[in-house]
Amino acid sequence: MSQKPTSHPYKPNMTQDELKALVGQAALPYVEPGSIVGVGTGSTVNKFIDALATMKDRIAGAVSSSVASTERLQAIGIKVFDATEVDELAVYIDGADEIDHAGYMIKGGGAALTREKIVAAQSRKFVCIADESKLVQTLGSFPLPVEVIPMAARRIARQFAALGGTATLRSKGGAESGEPLVTDNGQHILDVTGLKITDPLGFESQVNQWPGVVTVGVFAFQKAHVCLLGASDGVRTLVF
């Protein structure tokens, strides 16, 4: 991993929301004029979409990883293509719930992990945008999202228990609602705590082979190539 200094506007004591806007703006130079850009999901990506409005007439459009991002892109006048209409994307811009010093990530806090992984796989470069709190030594402190087919959820939870993890079915509107969250793909999400993921590649490969797992929120095979990190001294650029 190499690191480059910031070259983006910065002021001291920025809020987390301001840092998200800063890294969203910092991602714009990675967008090639005339291209179709891959766009992820989440609060930091929303700031990138807002910044992308300034160059909407210089790109051909976007491929989005969620219904929410599609609606936000269309609201500012950016054409959204279906992933099946595009063979390859130059760049994919998305956030992370955790990222380590090798560019491996945990993603899926916004429940869009499967589509995020699909769009990332179509892209030549993955640019992660995040604040410095997301940079970790070892993945696993953030609850690991796993998209599952509902009929397999209990069995998969037991498999995680055998690894030392505790899986909880994500609820729509919070745990008190009792109603399972349904993803854009019509599936459910397990959030798994108590894991230390020291071998992200091996872990992703292992869990993705369990029957009923749609995808696990470890992004090791689709790792970040660059991370723009909103830090106490501005934007740090990490290159993996």
UniProtKB/Swiss-Prot annotation:
UniProt pathway: Carbohydrate degradation; pentose phosphate pathway; D-ribose 5-phosphate from D-ribulose 5-phosphate (non-oxidative stage): step 1/1
Coiled-coil region(s): none
InterPro entries linked to this entry: NagB/RpiA_transferase-like, Ribose5P_isomerase_typA_subgr, Ribose5P_isomerase_type_A
Top EC class, one word: isomerase
Known catalytic reactions: aldehydo-D-ribose 5-phosphate = D-ribulose 5-phosphate
Keywords: Isomerase
E.C. no: 5.3.1.6
Gene3D superfamilies recorded: 3.30.70.260, 3.40.50.1360
One BP term from GO: D-ribose metabolic process
Entry annotation: catalytic residues: E116 (proton acceptor)
Positions contributing to substrate binding: T41, G42, S43, T44, D94, G95, A96, D97, K107, G108, G109, G110, K134
GO cellular component, one term: cytosol
One annotated GO molecular function: ribose-5-phosphate isomerase activity
Record CDD domains: RPI_A
Family classification: Belongs to the ribose 5-phosphate isomerase family.
Subunit structure and binding partners: Homodimer.
Function: Catalyzes the reversible conversion of ribose-5-phosphate to ribulose 5-phosphate.
UniProt name for this protein: Ribose-5-phosphate isomerase A
